[in-house]
Regions:
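Hydrophobic faces of well-ordered beta-strands that scaffold small-molecule active sites
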Residues: 10-12, 41-45, 81-83, 101-103, ...
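Active-site-adjacent beta->alpha loops and helix N-cap segments on the catalytic face
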Residues: 61-63, 89-90, 105-120, 132-140, ...
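N-terminal active-site wall of soluble small-molecule enzyme domains
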Residues: 45-102, 109-113
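Catalytic alpha/beta core domains of metabolic enzymes, predominantly
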Residues: 129-224
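N-terminal amphipathic alpha-helix/helix-capping segment at the start of soluble metabolic enzymes
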Residues: 1-10
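Glycine-rich, proline-tolerant flexible connector loops at the mouths of alpha/beta enzymes
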Residues: 14-19, 44-61, 229-236
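Catalytic beta/alpha-barrel core
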Residues: 79-87, 100-110, 123-134, 153-157
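Single conserved hydrophobic/aromatic residue that forms the stacking wall/gate
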Residues: 246-255
């Protein structure tokens, strides 16, 4: 069960599917820690990163091959799966494999996309855009509810602070909790430094523990964390990824 008063849930995995072997390895690392630290676990991976800085950037295996890999992972480990969609037509096939459909932050105002995702009846994870206030996300919630879907999660991922930087307003957690929806904290992407690596996004992954502690202290439902066996070699958002050594996260609120 996912909720602000329930046991912490981690949406954990990789930024994008690089290979079947890699995501299976990452899933096993999270499963091991979820058992030891007693948090609920949902595996996250993208089949396509449509929003990349450069045309040369790696995007992923695509819808068909990506869903096949996610389906195999789900069957092997009996895990709930989260992935994101970028176009309305992707909602139906994704809903046949995944338990949670994520709306990317940059696409959260795309009404057709949001509505098609909501029509599947799946849990919808709404990533609050970097350019949007906490209260504005409530309009997106209404779009989902307009087609009868009240299974909605709100996810904080920082706000634009000048050029090439993001900051997290800690008050956003309490504002979003006013909706009574489960609130998550995307620690990984809140540490982005967009455009700082010329053709890709930089980041400050070394501060993941500090931000994770701050988020947990707000009594939220869970954290969103992406990892990689070697972040320096990750094909997308490596500078923001959590190293395996940092997967041992605090799971009780800090006072």
């Amino acid at each position: 069960k996912i909720g602000n008063s329930e046991r912490l849930t981690i949406f954990g995995g990789v930024n994008v599917i690089e290979s079947k072997e890699l995501i299976f390895e990452v899933a096993e690392a999270f499963i091991k820690n979820s058992s030891k630290l007693k948090f609920n676990f949902v595996f996250k991976a993208s089949f396509d990163k449509a929003n990349r800085s450069s045309l040369d950037s790696y995007r992923g295996p695509g819808l068909e091959d990506g869903l096949k890999i996610l389906s195999e992972l789900k069957q092997k480990y009996n895990l709930p799966i989260l992935t994101d969609i970028h176009e309305p037509h992707q909602a139906k096939p994704v809903s046949e494999v995944c338990d949670i459909i994520q709306i990317p932050a940059f696409l959260c105002r795309q009404t057709d996309l949001v509505v098609e995702a909501a029509k599947t009846g799946k849990i919808i994870n709404l990533k609050k855009p970097q350019f949007m206030s906490a209260k504005e996300i409530f309009h997106v919630v209404k779009k989902c509810e307009s087609v009868g879907n009240k299974n909605i999660i709100l996810c904080e991922r920082g706000n634009i602070f000048g050029y090439n930087n993001l900051v997290v307003d800690i008050l956003n957690f309490q504002i979003m909790k006013e909706s009574t929806k489960p609130v998550f904290f995307d620690v990984t992407h809140s540490l982005q430094q967009p455009g700082t690596l010329e053709k890709s996004t930089g980041g400050r992954g070394e501060y993941v523990l500090e931000l994770a502690k701050a988020g947990i202290s707000q009594g939220i439902a869970g954290l969103f964390l992406e990892t990689h066996p070697d972040p320096s070699k990750a094909l997308c958002d490596g500078p923001c990824a959590v190293s395996y050594t940092h997967l041992t996260l605090p799971t009780t609120p800090y006072v």
